[in-house]
């Protein structure tokens, strides 16, 4: 069965907010949702041109779409995001927390920890997704159900010390996925998707990315399209909550002492 043929629960409003939706993985997720019949709010921070272009593309697929701006590193801006989406599309049934801050730091002299960078990761990668999850629940009428999907990382099961603040913020979001699933059941399901090497990491070259992409036990990493298929499966699987789908080609099963961008 094609992922686009999945049956969705009738009580689930077919409206979605995708953070970081204008580019890269988020863009693919938005297109997949639209093709499955969801109206889509495309969140962006700086990429307004890309967001507006994507909105036009989604509308051509026969759904409603809008672009909504927010800086998820700023609590006031993040707090207004879901209300913006709801004002244009109505009740939001699906929240995809895809946006992520990903800046390098480690417990080394070359890239030491700083309070500023640590807190930026925490606000963007942990607090904002949990705040939006709470807001989704608050605006959802009693007769409706909802789904939250958090984009995590396979390295939570296969840790290395690179990108320390990022990793800690994603680890907190993974635990938040479980806690939110417990708190918001039975009307709202909360799930995680943990990608592997899906796009170039940092300053990784295209050639190196292609090589590393084939070094998992399945000899392929995950593609943005794989993640979109996982998202649609979650939306169509009403018995799933509080767990994470590993969509990584088995990358989490092979120990790695460093981030993939530093490996030979």
Where are the regions a protein language model picked out?
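Active-site loop of short-chain dehydrogenase/reductase
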Residues: 12-14, 63-64, 91-92, 139-153, ...
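Conserved glycine-rich cofactor-binding loop
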Residues: 22-24
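Conserved Rossmann-fold SDR core element
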Residues: 33, 174, 184-198, 240-247
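Conserved glycine-rich Rossmann-like NAD(P)H-binding loop of the short-chain dehydrogenase/reductase
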Residues: 38-53
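Catalytic loop of short-chain dehydrogenase/reductase
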Residues: 101-102, 109, 113-117, 146-185, ...
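A conserved structural motif in NAD(P)-dependent oxidoreductases
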Residues: 216-227
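C-terminal substrate-recognition "lid" of short-chain dehydrogenase/reductases
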Residues: 225-247, 252-253
């Amino acid at each position: 069965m094609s992922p686009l043929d999945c049956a969705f629960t009738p009580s689930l409003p077919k409206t979605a907010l995708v953070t970081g939706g204008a580019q890269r993985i988020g863009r693919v997720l938005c297109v997949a949702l639209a093709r499955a019949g969801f109206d889509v709010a495309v969140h962006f921070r700086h990429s307004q041109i890309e967001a507006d272009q994507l909105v036009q593309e989604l509308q051509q697929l026969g759904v409603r779409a809008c672009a909504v701006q927010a800086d998820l590193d700023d609590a006031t801006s993040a707090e207004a995001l879901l209300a913006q989406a709801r004002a244009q599309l109505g009740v939001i049934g699906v929240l995809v927390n895809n946006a992520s801050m990903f800046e390098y730091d480690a417990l080394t002299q070359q890239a030491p920890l700083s309070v500023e960078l640590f807190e930026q990761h925490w606000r963007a990668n942990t607090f904002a997704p949990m705040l939006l999850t709470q807001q989704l629940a608050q605006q959802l009428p009693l007769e409706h159900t909802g789904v939250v999907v958090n984009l995590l990382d396979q390295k939570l099961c296969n840790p290395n010390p690179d990108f320390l603040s990022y990793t800690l913020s994603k680890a907190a979001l993974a635990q938040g996925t479980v806690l939110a699933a417990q708190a918001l059941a039975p009307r709202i399901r909360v799930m995680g998707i943990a990608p592997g090497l899906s796009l170039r990491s940092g300053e990784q070259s295209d050639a190196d990315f292609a090589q590393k992409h084939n070094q998992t036990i399945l000899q392929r990493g995950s593609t943005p399209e794989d993640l979109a298929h996982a998202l649609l499966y979650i939306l169509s699987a009403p018995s799933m909550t509080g767990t994470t789908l590993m969509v990584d080609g088995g990358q989490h099963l092979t120990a790695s002492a460093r981030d993939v961008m530093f490996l030979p």
